[in-house]
Amino acid sequence: MSDPTHREVESQNDKPLEMNWINSKGEEIYLLVPKTVYPPREDTELLDLCISKIGNGNGRKLLEIGCGSGALSISAANNGWRVTACDINPLAVVATKGNAERNKVKLELFEGGLDESNSNSDFLHHFENDGPFDLIVWNLPYLSPPLEGEPRLGPLEDAGLIDSEGNEGWGEILLNLINQKPTLLKKGGAIYLLHTNNPRGNLLQSTWRQSLWATRIVGENDLEDGERLTYFSA
């Protein structure tokens, strides 16, 4: 069985990756990361550093969309944020729950995420009940959707790593949601998003500014392959 879906199913029997991740404050976070779940990488480290520059959360509310292994949410909770985290990959939610327990932090967790029409009632229910949030962070799926006939990842990896196949990318879909429901973000709150230097990413900040949001770059990282990761706040 060689198709992506079967490979994903078979990979769940593999031993999860064990790692000790060091956050921007030098704190060690022990993680078990199953296959198909996004582990902490350069982009995770960059966003963790950006959040740490805000200072201690002091009980303020943070929402992480697409929590993956939970590394970022656990780091934020360790530093005083009240964290709600979600992921559309059920294995990521399970991994984050287990990793939070291993590191003795409390998170609010749910399975789900945005959809292209912003009509996911379960996600909106959690979003509205747990908010308003002082900070919303999302390491956006930034791989370009494959063209017809090109190889795909498995369904879970596709959902977590590949940008929306519609006319709008996930960063713009989130913008539409916040504009429709501004009370999800606390007055004076901020949104931190990562984008890469692909065509959609290069336009994302100007798209937010066209909707009268002020944006500023809070962190950048140039990778060896020429890719540039940029975090901006709105």
Model region roles, listed by residue range:
Residues 2-79, 95, 115-119, 217, ...:
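SAM-dependent Rossmann-like transferase core, predominantly class I methyltransferases
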Residues 26-27, 103-107, 213:
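A short helix-to-beta-strand connector/capping loop
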Residues 39, 90-91, 199-200:
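Short alpha-helical
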Residues 45-149:
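Conserved SAM/SAH cofactor-binding pocket of Class I
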Residues 79, 152-156, 208-211:
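Glycine-rich, phosphate-binding/catalytic loops in enzymes
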Residues 121-122, 147-152, 204, 228-229:
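Short aromatic-enriched loop/helix-cap "lid" or pocket-rim segments at secondary-structure transitions
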Residues 140-173:
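Mobile active-site "lid"/loop adjacent to the S-adenosyl-L-methionine
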Residues 169-231:
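Conserved Class I SAM-dependent methyltransferase catalytic core
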